Curated annotation (Swiss-Prot):
PROSITE patterns: NAC
DNA-binding region: 111-168
Protein name in UniProt: NAC domain-containing protein 55
Molecular functions (GO terms): DNA binding; DNA-binding transcription factor activity
Keyword Heme found: no
Short name of one Pfam family: NAM
Tissues of expression: Expressed in leaves.
One GO CC annotation: nucleus
NAC domain segment(s): 14-162
Length: 317
């Protein structure tokens, strides 16, 4: 059985809410100067690796601590045996300096230099730029060994990945949308969903009342379903004062028959002075004698029963 690999962060036993956000001066004085002098740290937060052997996206897994930025102590090699230029080749690409070096001072004394670098994939000078950034901290007077290939025994590096402009814009849009929703979006959205739910339930009630089974060939298509409206009070009282639009059923090449159930109400309909009484809803077909000028209207009486009156058009009022 192999040894179980321990989580470096779990071994640190850090208190809840601990954060590591040192300033440039603290990194230089409290960490790099002490590391170069051979001092040990009671709490190891910065890993020791040869940073230039890895691609930057591999480095977070080798850090001891950090979520969005990671810190490392690393040696820095010479590009040429007797030269003073550092070797910037790393992994599948290279680090390229950008911007102006910043001098770090403490108590009026200069102690180090901060340099910013960007990682490029490929070979210089035609590499592809990435969003990986390094801040390299080095001492002004490093300890150098004659004949050594190392330019510095230790430099301190901060690694992080910069957000693109598109990522920043997406984040800003998300935050703006969240604020708008919290201010007025929730009430508007809630009302809209309630209105949709009411209409959907009314369509289901209408199908059940007319005896349509789910998936039945006699079920009215959506475009031929009665349209419930209330021009007075919005959607309050929809169930009490329905208005059905049956105009689309007239003149169709194929009009579905309306199936009857034993509980369907009685409806009176007629033409002019002639009225007829029938039990249930009339059946319509292509040879129907009912024209667009004929019609009937229903008014609820005695609970479930209906009595009709002549209407100017064809449809429920």
């Amino acid at each position: 059985m192999g040894l179980q690999e321990l989580d470096p962060l779990a071994q640190l036993s850090l208190p809840p809410g601990f954060r590591f956000y040192p300033t440039d001066e603290e990194l230089m004085v409290e960490y790099l100067c002490r590391k170069a002098a051979g001092h040990d740290f009671s709490l190891q937060l910065i890993a020791e690796i040869d940073l230039y052997k890895f691609d930057p996206w591999v480095l977070p897994s080798k850090a001891l601590f950090g979520e969005k930025e990671w810190y490392f102590f690393s040696p820095r090699d010479r590009k040429y045996p007797n030269g003073s230029r550092p070797n910037r080749v790393a992994g599948s690409g290279y680090w390229k300096a950008t911007g102006t070096d910043k001098v770090i001072s403490t108590e009026g004394r200069r102690v180090g230099i901060k340099k910013a670098l960007v990682f490029y994939i490929g070979k210089a000078p035609k590499g592809t730029k990435t969003n990986w950034i390094m801040h390299e901290y080095r001492l002004i007077e490093p300890s150098r060994r004659n004949g050594s290939t190392k330019l510095d025994d230790w430099v301190l590096c901060r690694i992080y990945k910069k957000q693109t402009s598109a990522q920043k814009q997406a984040y800003n849009n998300l935050m703006t949308s969240g604020r708008e929703y919290s201010n007025n979006g929730s009430s508007t959205s809630s009302s809209s969903h309630q209105y949709d739910d009411v209409l959907e339930s009314l369509h289901e009630i209408d199908n059940r009342s007319l005896g349509f089974a789910a998936g039945s060939s006699n079920a009215l298509p959506h475009s031929h379903r009665p349209v419930l409206t209330n021009h007075k009070t919005g959607f309050q009282g929809l169930a009490r004062e329905p208005s059905f639009d049956w105009a689309n059923l007239i003149g169709q090449n194929s009009v579905p028959e309306l199936g009857l159930s034993h509980n369907v109400p009685s409806i009176r309909y007629g033409d002019g002075g002639t009225q007829q009484q029938t039990e249930g809803i009339p059946r319509f077909n292509n040879n129907s004698d009912v024209s667009a000028n004929q019609g009937f209207s229903v008014d609820p009486v005695n609970g479930f029963g209906y009595s009709g009156q002549q209407s100017s058009g064809f449809g429920f009022i």
